[in-house]
Swiss-Prot record:
This is G/U mismatch-specific DNA glycosylase. Excises ethenocytosine and uracil, which can arise by alkylation or deamination of cytosine, respectively, from the corresponding mispairs with guanine in ds-DNA. It is capable of hydrolyzing the carbon-nitrogen bond between the sugar-phosphate backbone of the DNA and the mispaired base. The complementary strand guanine functions in substrate recognition. Required for DNA damage lesion repair in stationary-phase cells. Keywords: Cytoplasm, DNA damage, DNA excision, DNA repair, DNA-binding, Hydrolase. Its EC number is 3.2.2.28. It is found in: Cytoplasm. It is an enzyme of class 3 (hydrolase). GO terms for biological process: base-excision repair, AP site formation. Pfam families: UDG (PF03167). The gene is mug.
Length: 168
């Protein structure tokens, strides 16, 4: 099982869709070697070095956290059922209300739309918020996602810069 890495006072909580099999086997988030999460958050400015999946707890040192919409591991996120995403969205709102990070970054547009019953959303900052927490939708860093790493970094850096502009 891949546990959440959460604490009060975080700049951002990154929310993946669900654990892949590599993460489920190791217990660490974003553990598959092809997953670009750790590289992208470093290059975007969230960490001062590229962490390894087994160093996930160190995210807290950078005021970052990690959670997921669905606990059940799958080979591909497309295997996650709509009812799981909807339930996960409700659970995620409760977590965010409890921890109150400055921002929530949901990693995947379709997962966000299904988990939060939204339609036709754009990438980036959303109109909805959870209390004082800004909600962002960023591209998923999975190696199965064809988006180029440079575009991922650009999208994640936009969030980092928005937080810096708010003094966070």
């Amino acid at each position: 099982m891949v546990k959440d890495i959460l604490a009060p006072g975080l700049r951002v909580v990154f929310c993946g869709i669900n654990p892949g099999l590599s993460s489920a086997n190791t217990g660490f988030p974003f553990a598959h070697p092809a997953n670009r999460f750790w590289k992208v958050i470093h290059l975007a400015g969230f960490t001062d070095r590229q962490l390894k999946p087994e160093e996930a707890e160190k995210l807290l040192d950078f005021r970052c956290g990690v959670t997921k919409l669905v606990d059940r591991p799958t080979v591909q996120a497309t295997e996650v059922k709509l009812h799981e995403l909807r339930s996960g969205g409700r659970n995620l709102i409760e977590k965010i209300e409890d921890y109150q990070p400055a921002a929530l970054a949901v990693l995947g547009k379709q997962a966000f739309e299904q988990g939060f019953s939204q339609r036709g959303i754009a990438w980036g900052k959303q109109k909805i918020a959870i209390g004082a927490t800004m909600v962002w939708v960023l591209p998923n860093p999975s190696g199965l996602n064809r988006i180029k790493t440079e575009k991922l970094v650009e999208a994640y850096r936009e969030l980092d810069q928005a937080l810096i502009m708010r003094g966070l």
